[in-house]
């Protein structure tokens, strides 16, 4: 396509964040609408360190919808992608019928998306990806209002990435899912001392995807039903209270207990699912020994459907814990490769602490770590030079 053919080209680029659940979503009561068996709650991470960037262009010259993810063309006919595209076009058409300006929804779209973190390795890439897709489509087609229900149809946890800070995904009661939406509990500025440390154990794609894993859990795990009915409702209330009171020991305890219960459900699934590996188990042990040394919860772990740990802590405690991780998982790469994100001050470790923790170091057990904090929801990228698609509507070399 030559550029003069695309005089009508419209293009929007946005970024969207990863969110990491502290009360986990695991299991659907409706596979088509992606309605959960339990409510969940997450922290939205800062986009300076983890984000999806998506450019969407539309033109009457495009013959079909296309999508490229991390430089590779993907199948646009995927049912979840189609659900999001159809729903946004339906909402845009409704606005157009009321006289609001909107791009021509009959025009085909080209979508180009990149993650600045490993895809499908348990770092919530689908949540950021679908949130970014829906938000960018909404900007392109001038769709306003509640979008989390649309993002949910792409990936359940994507609905939480449409807001910054602390976000709950409500269980909802309606069979059509209209009330199963995300809602902000507190903004990213509410608890400025909270810090997040991601310990990347493996960037490999997991052997059992979340979608198939949770389907098997719903079919076979009695513990899943017990958790949804008897545990999560009370735990959600406790977690929201801990966030509002900025009560880190309670926040940390609830976070770790919920992570453990999620992985217990994975073991209770038949056949069982193993997302954690030996390094994951060592990290769990390290966190508990570190907290025991101080007699209080200073750091807390959570693991999604993968071996990588997400550590929550407070600004004053994080520097020392970073050194603890370095000591017990000594890196075999340089500092720039091993530590990324928000800088932390150097800290010294006492011989007494190292002796008390009493763990054998595992060299190269952790590939790298990312230091970050809570951050805002999706944003529009104003600089046209940062578009991932060129004037011909095809991916730029930089996006491949």
Curated annotation (Swiss-Prot):
GO terms for cellular component: cytosol. It catalyses: (R)-5-diphosphomevalonate + ATP = isopentenyl diphosphate + ADP + phosphate + CO2. (R)-5-diphosphomevalonate binds at residues 25-28, 80, 155-160, 211. It is found in: Cytoplasm. GO terms for molecular function: ATP binding; diphosphomevalonate decarboxylase activity. One of its GO terms (biological process) is regulation of angiogenesis. Its main location: cytoplasm. It comes from the Eukaryota. It holds the Pfam family MDD_C. Keywords: ATP-binding, Cholesterol biosynthesis, Cholesterol metabolism, Cytoplasm, Lipid biosynthesis, Lipid metabolism, Lyase, Nucleotide-binding, Steroid biosynthesis, Steroid metabolism, Sterol biosynthesis, Sterol metabolism. Its EC number is 4.1.1.33. Belongs to the diphosphomevalonate decarboxylase family. NCBIfam families: mevDPdecarb. Homodimer. This is Diphosphomevalonate decarboxylase. It comes from Danio rerio.
């Amino acid at each position: 396509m030559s550029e003069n053919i695309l005089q009508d080209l419209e293009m929007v680029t946005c970024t969207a964040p990863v969110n990491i659940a502290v009360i986990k979503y695991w299991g659907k009561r409706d596979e088509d609408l992606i309605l959960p068996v339990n409510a969940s709650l997450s922290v939205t991470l800062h986009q300076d360190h983890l984000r999806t960037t998506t450019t969407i262009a539309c033109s009457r010259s495009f013959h079909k919808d296309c999508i490229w993810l991390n430089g590779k063309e993907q199948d646009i006919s995927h049912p979840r992608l189609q659900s999001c595209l159809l729903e946004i076009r339906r909402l845009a058409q409704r606005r157009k019928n009321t006289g609001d300006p909107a791009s021509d929804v009959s025009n085909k779209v080209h979508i180009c998306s990149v993650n600045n973190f490993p895809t499908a390795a348990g770092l919530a890439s689908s949540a950021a990806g679908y949130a970014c897709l829906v938000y960018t489509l909404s900007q392109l087609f001038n769709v306003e209002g509640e979008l989390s229900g649309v993002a949910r149809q792409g990936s359940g946890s994507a609905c939480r990435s449409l807001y910054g800070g602390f976000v709950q995904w409500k269980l909802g009661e309606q069979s059509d899912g209209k009330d199963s939406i995300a809602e902000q509990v507190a903004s990213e500025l509410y608890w400025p001392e909270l810090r997040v440390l991601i310990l990347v154990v493996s960037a490999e794609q997991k052997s059992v995807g979340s979608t198939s894993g949770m389907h098997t859990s719903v079919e076979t795990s009695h513990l899943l039903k017990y958790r949804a009915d008897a545990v999560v409702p009370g735990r959600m209330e406790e977690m929201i209270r801990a966030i509002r009171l900025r009560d880190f020991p309670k926040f940390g305890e609830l976070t770790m207990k919920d992570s453990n219960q999620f992985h217990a459900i994975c073991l209770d699934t038949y056949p069982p699912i193993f997302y954690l590996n030996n390094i994951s188990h060592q990290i769990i042990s390290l966190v508990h020994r570190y907290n025991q040394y101080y007699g209080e919860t200073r750091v807390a772990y959570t693991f999604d459907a993968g071996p990588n740990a997400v550590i929550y802590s407070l600004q004053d405690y994080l520097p020392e814990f970073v050194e603890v991780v370095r000591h017990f998982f000594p890196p075999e790469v340089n500092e720039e490769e091993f530590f990324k994100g928000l800088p932390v001050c150097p800290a010294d470790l006492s011989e007494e602490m190292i002796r008390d923790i009493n763990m054998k170091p595992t060299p190269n057990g952790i590939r790298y770590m990312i230091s970050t904090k809570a951050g805002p929801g999706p944003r529009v990228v104003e600089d046209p030079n940062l578009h991932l698609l060129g004037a011909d509507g095809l991916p730029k070399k930089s996006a491949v």
